[in-house]
UniProtKB/Swiss-Prot annotation:
SUPFAM superfamilies: Ribosome recycling factor, RRF. One of its GO terms (biological process) is translational termination. Gene3D superfamilies: 3.30.1360.40, Ribosome-recycling factor. Keywords: Cytoplasm, Protein biosynthesis. It is found in: Cytoplasm. Its main location: cytoplasm. It comes from Corynebacterium urealyticum (strain ATCC 43042 / DSM 7109). Transmembrane segments: none annotated. NCBIfam families: frr. This is Ribosome-recycling factor. The gene is frr. One of its GO terms (cellular component) is cytoplasm. One of its GO terms (molecular function) is ribosomal large subunit binding. Responsible for the release of ribosomes from messenger RNA at the termination of protein biosynthesis. May increase the efficiency of translation by recycling ribosomes from one round of translation to another. Belongs to the RRF family.
Amino acid sequence: MMDEILLECEERMTSSVEFAREDLTTIRTGRANPAMFNSVIAEYYGVPTPITQMATISVPEARMMLIKPYEQSQIQVIENAIRNSDLGVNPTNDGQVLRVTIPQLTEERRREMVRQAKSKGEDAKIAIRNIRRHGMEQLAKIQKDGDAGEDEVRASENELEKITSNYVKQVDELVERKEEELMEV
């Protein structure tokens, strides 16, 4: 019973770290990275669709991306979605493909992005701690119901603390790597 609680908590913490990893890829650095478009949504025949499913995105140069829609009729829709996103990039449309040049980040913009990364990391750590709290409550309930002894519950609580510390450390490392990537000129 207690092992199941620990396993469930660990699975949920893993998904929180994965979500944080995905979330951090949406913060753009000074380099072209197709993952930055993962969160850009465009209307595709009335259905909100990620533009990554509407076009191929390639990186011919370090700070340039080419976006080639699967359907030429959607080029304007994709262009507007990118322009209206919070990425701070401006695509140029040549009728066939969209060219997106990634501007050099200013020092101020870099610091803003670092703050954003830290905020996303903090959100992930809060989610992990909430999972820990939920697990601790379940363990306390097991002890209260008399299904397990105090020593067993305490050992499981200690194990849950170790698991939590491990996942919080993983999030810290993700944020640290993103920060280094952002501050690189």
